[in-house]
């Protein structure tokens, strides 16, 4: 009897266990493909289907993102550098599935729903608090008049019926902002550059600016702040160099 129990506890080679694991994963993927096929959706590649451990990894990454956000906000810092301009230009440079929902909400609130989009904003304490919370995903600074003009002329658009429309016709601008004496693209540029009385109305009219993906070596894919050799955070007037390379 003891011999039979001993036989039941025979050692299972590691390679056999790995094959079982791979077989189970393949069965899971095939099940997902079958579910997608039955629902009438377009079939996905095997590589596109998430395995159970992928969901665990994504969940943990989101939790880490939230913890680090709280640490950035609570961390005592020296006095921040003085604000050099009333105008800030913000570029989203990172972030896909590894961010906490709160981070995503802040980025959406800033109209930065996609990587390599940029927006103008008025420099306020509230804005810088938001930027601190999403610091690993954005870089920002103070655009000069040339950068503002180049961005609006090359990338400026408004959203009409859900679609971006380039600002190639002054009539579009006049119809939307004529009551504020903004009659064309030059008036629009001036209102943004000096953060005029109707800056808020202009920002509601202006859609997010879709920038070009930077070439190699422009960004280092590092989440450290710019002042420490990374990509993120406040570049101050150095933002103009990045704008020229992405516009």
Curated annotation (Swiss-Prot):
Transmembrane regions listed in the UniProt entry: none
Superkingdom of the source species: Eukaryota
A UniProt-annotated Pfam family: Ribosomal_L30_N
A Gene Ontology BP annotation from the UniProt entry: maturation of LSU-rRNA from tricistronic rRNA transcript (SSU-rRNA, 5.8S rRNA, LSU-rRNA)
GO MF annotation terms: RNA binding; structural constituent of ribosome
Keywords, ordered alphabetically: Ribonucleoprotein, Ribosomal protein
Any single GO CC term annotated in Swiss-Prot or TrEMBL for this entry: cytosolic large ribosomal subunit
Family assignment from sequence similarity: Belongs to the universal ribosomal protein uL30 family.
Name under which the protein is recorded: Large ribosomal subunit protein uL30z
Organism in which the protein naturally occurs: Arabidopsis thaliana (Mouse-ear cress)
